[in-house]
Amino acid sequence: MSWAGKLLRVNLTKGICQSEALNMQWAKDYLGSRGLGTKYLVEEMDAKVDPLSPENKIIWATGPLTGTMASTGGRYTVITKGPLTGAIACSNSGGYWGAELKMAGWDMVIFEGKSPKPVYLLIQDDEVQLLDATDLWGKSVWDTEPAIKAKHQDPQIRVSCIGRAGENQVLFAAVVNDLHRAAGRSGVGAVMGSKNLKAIAVRGTKGVGNFKDPKAFMAASKAAKAVLAGNAVTGQGLPTYGTQVLMNVINEVGALPTRNHRDVQFEGAKDISAEAMATPRASDGKAQLVTNQACFGCTIACGRVSKIDQTHFSIQNKPQYFGASGGLEYEAAWALGAANGVNDLEALQYANMICNEDGFDPITFGATIGAVMELYEMGLLTKEQLGIDAKFGSAQALCHFVDITAKGEGFGKEIALGSARLTAKYGQPDLSMSVKGQEFPAYDGRVIQGIGLAYATSNRGACHLRGYTIASEVLGIPVKTEPADTVGKPGLVKAFQDATAAFDSAGICIFTSFAWTLADVAPQLQAACGDEFTVENLTTIGERIWNMERDFNNRAGFTSKDDKLPKRLMTEAAKTGPGKGSISGLDKMLPEYYDLRGWDHDGQLKSDTRTRLGL
């Protein structure tokens, strides 16, 4: 059946770990990972709880294809109520940790309560221990993982943990596994820190192989891998250039948010692009890019491994950063770079390294620095407050801020709040480029209309991974739609959102959807789990998950008033590029989107929508 069939419930307050049978009806209705984990959360928890209180729960969940031979079957999701937004937080990660949990015989782990002291959970197949983490508290991600492996004398243990940002409850702290892969958004790491939970270490030896039809599964998996290999994006573009291939593409479209969304094109885009990463430096004749890297079972291998120039100011007298590390990915390069007007590639990689080492989201961090730099140039923040001259374009300021954020030193305590709270504190809330308190990713929503609608309606706050209409509006996948058009975009956004929920919940990477449709996923799920997982049923499952998340947010207090974009995107036209003169057409699209969703004018689920989806 592909699911392991059991979950682990950990009461941190009492120090008790208990095994439970997985609710198989829920598994059939919500698949796993994002969908099934959210189902458990919404059924067990009041939506109005304080995200950083013991009453909040946090769940690690795998999907039915996690740990299998399905390409990219290494994904898992961390589900909780997010402190950055106060909304549902479902943050997805790759690497090897998710597959290891599945191989240990567990579909998910549910944490509740709060430990009286720092602890970590050790899972070795069926043997589970909650252990003292006092000696680990205060350590970085990069020190925590090797310390746990050394303590248990097992280099094959996989670790999902927090760094200093999570411990100090930075509101955009991440959960990091395999040193460089992260459930990065919405502050899931802060929830972990609020519970005094440092890490989950897993070693699984059982394997995953309880398929309904093993031969059919192998055939379906093989066919799907061939589709990935033959696709220009998943077979060529991503393996060669990684996600950074988008930097020049999006800049040419005129949709690369620059200097806190004041501009839509960055004159330094080529300096921080994938091509620049692969070009030998003048200083030492070596390229920053060392190699590409794959997550568990992945045939795409979009990950990057890089080295910083040892003479760069950011790592002078810091030999611990001379080695190779993960990155840069497109979103991080944009947030640390164009969003702040910084075109120093070495500085971006340094900042990305610290985000990984200390465990916090580079998107929210970088976007928050963009707001700080604008406040500084407006004279609302001073050099004395910030500790540095922080004009747009300053690589030195970027590196200074990344060093102090997780530690909570100086102005780092303010940055740790995220841009929405920070700009409100200084009387300029319109300078936060965010939705529901979560900062925008690397696409301008007034130039590309569909992604603007996707941001506004995303259940976890602004997010490209909840409805990646860039595939259609820029790349022409599966069909080309015009970025400037608003007609037809509500249906496009809904379709992408529902399909993405199904992909996430299956336990596979969303990047497969550049080549796959649900028609490629369905045969794999049918062979692994059961005949009921048709394309039609998977589409309904995705829609059910989306509406379940929305309903949680409604009960938490969110309404249609929260489905909005910043004033800048609604009133300040794009200055350059193909979309020059554009503003967001959100007001034209939102009513139709609500109708397609089966929601009322206040963004609440109608009764017939609940009935149709079984909510």
For each feature predicted by the language model, list its residue ranges.
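Intrinsically disordered, low-complexity segments enriched in small residues
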Residues: 1-92, 96-615
